[in-house]
UniProtKB/Swiss-Prot annotation:
Disordered: region residues: 424-447
Residues engaged in binding Mg(2+): E69
Subunit text: Dimer of alpha and beta chains. A typical microtubule is a hollow water-filled tube with an outer diameter of 25 nm and an inner diameter of 15 nM. Alpha-beta heterodimers associate head-to-tail to form protofilaments running lengthwise along the microtubule wall with the beta-tubulin subunit facing the microtubule plus end conferring a structural polarity. Microtubules usually have 13 protofilaments but different protofilament numbers can be found in some organisms and specialized cells.
Annotated protein name in UniProt: Tubulin beta chain
Localization (cell): Cytoplasm, Cytoskeleton
Taxonomic lineage: Eukaryota, Fungi, Dikarya, Ascomycota, Pezizomycotina
UniProt keyword annotation of Magnesium present: yes
Signal peptide interval: none
Record's compositionally biased regions (Acidic residues): 432-447
GO molecular function list: GTP binding; GTPase activity; metal ion binding; structural constituent of cytoskeleton
């Protein structure tokens, strides 16, 4: 079967990763130590996309856990799903990267990277037909951003034809954890543009908003945020983990979602949104789900798609859903909101169905959108980057680890290029002839 190797790096990546494994081991009927006691054969049928089978009916996540300090790892090991993971797959240093991208990418991380690659190699060799890799990390810190992108490029070298998907937590406009976030994020995006096939952008602030506005949680914890992220990750990977009528894998998703190789940064959403404890008691319908996933308040990245246009998007429905109803609803959304979809990609909404809903819900739907409005996110980080870089603030931390200012300049211009590419396609129309516009312009005035 088509296996995926999962990597989680840094504190954020490990916490999101732990939440993800907790969610999907529950969906596949595994208990806290990986023993299968599920009810349906469907749970077993594609178990091996994410799990290796060990002796005694036990399943082990195909996960590699990486960090430059032992703290988070110990927490994961002591957590509810800590007994799931293979002990050899914990790879950690002692020094920490101290929120410094250069430490993660060039010094501390580079020393640990071969050890990680050995584990990755071992996991990949155990696969029948490796589909690709997914990595969870944040872009604002040192380990997840610096070492995470280092791992991505190393894995890219070794497995050039496998898919590389990343779940990347972007720095938020209002919620900032570290002062040097803009540096770390820009350097990371510079890497992701080149080396990732699909990047799902997640943003703490958008998650906070969802928790407070929709779930009515007054002071959400990271646990609540990670719960939302794991719901989306579970949704995006549903088609890989369960048989469905309209199935997709990482490559199909990428083929349908990425019109131009550099523009592979997606917004994600999930419906129905429920808080961790309470499952909704009302029946959800396909129209409701569809309306919810196309609602800007449901997006887990702090950019409003109404300021841009969708190049492509994909909706994954789970549960007992009628195919015709889904098709009608999606067509309905497209017809009513033609302004938000580029007209030079007809039928740019892809749908997938899977009959197994998440635990505790009758049906749910996950949304992945490639919208030009994601440029807001990069623009915001870019502005903060420029403000600091102009004064060369904090640069000595990076140059001290052997980085060159040139690299910062390159990263900055690469990100600016990305923003203008999104802008260019946002404004593009079907009849891309400049001279035609000039002829049409006076006509509008005459009417």
């Amino acid at each position: 079967m088509r296996e995926i190797v999962h990597l989680q790096t840094g504190q954020c990546g490990n916490q999101i990763g732990a939440a993800f494994w907790q969610t999907i081991s529950g969906e596949h009927g595994l208990d806290g130590s990986g023993v299968y006691n599920g009810t349906s054969d469907l749970q077993l049928e594609r178990m091996n996309v994410y799990f290796n089978e060990a002796s005694g009916n036990k399943y082990v996540p195909r996960a590699v856990l990486v960090d430059l300090e032992p703290g988070t790892m110990d927490a994961v090991r002591a957590g509810p799903x800590g007994q799931l993971f293979r002990p050899d797959n914990f790879v950690f240093g002692q020094s920490g990267a101290g929120n410094n991208w250069a430490k993660g990418h060039y010094t501390e991380g580079a020393e640990l990277v071969d050890q990680v690659l050995d584990v990755v190699r071992r996991e990949a060799e155990g696969c029948d037909c490796l589909q690709g890799f997914q990595i969870t990390h944040s872009l604002g810190g040192g380990t997840g951003a610096g070492m995470g992108t280092l791992l991505i490029s190393k894995i890219r070298e070794e497995f050039p034809d496998r898919m590389m998907a990343t779940f990347s937590v972007m720095p938020s406009p209002k919620v900032s954890d570290t002062v040097v976030e803009p540096y770390n994020a820009t350097l990371s995006v510079h890497q992701l543009v080149e080396n990732s096939d699909a990047t799902f952008c997640i943003d703490n602030e958008a998650l906070y908003d969802i928790c407070m506005r929709t779930l009515k949680l007054n002071n959400p914890s990271y646990g609540d945020l990670n719960h939302l992220v794991s719901a989306v990750m579970s949704g995006v990977t549903t088609c890989l983990r369960f048989p469905g009528q309209l199935n997709s894998d990482l490559r199909k998703l990428a083929v349908n979602m990425v019109p131009f190789p550099r523009l592979h940064f997606f917004m994600v959403g999930f419906a129905p949104l429920t808080s961790r404890g309470a499952h909704s008691f009302r029946a959800v319908t396909v129209p409701e789900l569809t309306q919810q996933i196309f609602d800007p308040k449901n997006m887990m990245a702090a950019s409003d798609f109404r300021n841009g246009r969708y190049l492509t998007c994909s909706a994954i429905y789970r549960g007992k859903v009628s195919m015709k109803e889904v098709e009608d609803q999606i067509r309905n959304v497209q017809n009513k909101n033609t302004a938000y979809f580029v007209e030079w990609i007809p039928n740019n909404v892809q749908t997938a169905l899977c009959s197994i809903p998440p635990r505790g819900l009758k049906m749910s739907s996950t949304f992945v959108g490639n919208s030009t409005s994601i440029q807001e996110l990069f623009k915001r980080v870019g502005d903060q980057f420029t403000a600091m870089f102009r004064r060369k603030a904090f640069l000595h931390w990076y140059t001290g680890e052997g980085m060159d200012e040139m690299e910062f300049t390159e990263a900055e211009s690469n990100m600016n290029d990305l923003v203008s590419e999104y802008q260019q396609y946002q404004e593009a129309s079907v009849s891309e002839g400049e001279e035609e516009y000039d002829e049409e312009a006076p006509l509008e005035g005459e009417e």
